[in-house]
Every structure is written in C-alpha cells, then in structure tokens.
Design a protein with these regions (language model features):
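Short, structured beta/alpha segment
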Residues: 1-70, 92
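N-terminal Rossmann NAD(P)-binding subdomain characteristic of aldehyde/semialdehyde dehydrogenases
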Residues: 50-141
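Short hydrophobic alpha-helices that are characteristic scaffold elements of the AMP-binding
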Residues: 145-146
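A short hydrophobic/small-residue beta-strand
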Residues: 150-152
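Nucleotide-sugar donor-binding loop of glycosyltransferases
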Residues: 155
Length: 155
C-alpha cells in the first residue's frame, strides 16, 4: 500500500497535490477530544468562526477553483461556481439554524409543558464525492460545526 495519496489532473496526468494517508482512528480520536471544547462555545462564536472560514475561502477563491478544475477536470467556470456555493453555504446555514432551532416551550399531552432544546451529538464523518469535492461535503460540514459537532472529513 502506498504511503501517500496523489491526486492527478485528468487532462494531463500532472500531480495536483499529494499528502500522507491518514489514520482514520487517530483522526476520529482527535475530533472526539476536540469536540467538548467546540460544543461548549456559544452559537454566536461558532457562527463567527464559520464566517471567518467563508472569508478565508473568499480570499483564496481563485486558488480553490483552480484546484477543483484541475483535479476534477470540470470547466473553470463550474469550479468557480462551486467555490461560491461553499462560501454562501455559511450564511444559508446560519439563517436556517436560527429559524429551525430556537429554544422554545410547547404544550404537551395532558397539559404539560416541555422545553425543546438542540444540542451537539459528537463526531460526524463526512465522505466527499469526486464530482463536487468542496460543495457537497461542505453542505454537511458547515451545519454540523454550527450545531457544535466535530467533523472528520474524507475527501
């Protein structure tokens, strides 16, 4: 088995990037160890962290689009659109979270009142597809992080 993962450009066979093959158990353990601290942060803090992420992607938009286009073989305009979707997903998720997860009290059976609260669950695994390597996984990663979960991502 190889020690490194190498991504090649379909059109030319040139190496796009390479990296060490990770140890999944080690990565899950690291995420599990980091999760309590991340989950303890307020939703406002997590929103701000995700907005900083979106700004970092925006600042490197051309580089990300270049990498996606080279690695997948898709047209550059489509790769740019994918990167835009990655950026926009942050605000979409923040708005959806605010609308769908407020703490609220509701009437229950027999006249009882119950409180509905949302809480983080732990570590989530996200597997990325080859055809939309940033946009589709990001659609799971951003909401999971916003909700206070940790994520292990396998591109």
């Amino acid at each position: 088995m190889a020690d490194r993962l190498i991504s090649t450009e379909p059109a030319t066979g040139a190496e796009v990037w390479s990296g060490e093959i990770g140890d999944a158990a080690r990565e899950v353990a690291a995420a599990r160890a980091a999760w309590p601290e991340w989950a303890a942060h307020s939703v406002a803090y997590r929103c701000e962290a995700l907005r900083r992420f979106a700004n970092e992607v925006r600042a490197r938009e051309k580089d990300f689009a270049d990498t996606i286009a080279r690695e997948t073989g898709k047209p550059y305009w489509e790769a740019r659109t994918e990167v835009g979707s990655v950026i926009n997903k942050v605000e979409i998720s923040i708005n959806a979270y605010s609308e769908r997860t407020p703490q609220r009290k509701v009437e229950a059976a027999l006249g009882n009142k119950v409180a509905v609260r949302h809480k983080p669950h732990g570590v989530l695994a996200v597997l990325g597809p080859y055809n939309f390597p940033a946009h589709l996984p990001n659609g799971h990663i951003v909401p999971a992080l916003l909700a206070g979960n940790a994520v292990v991502f396998k591109p």
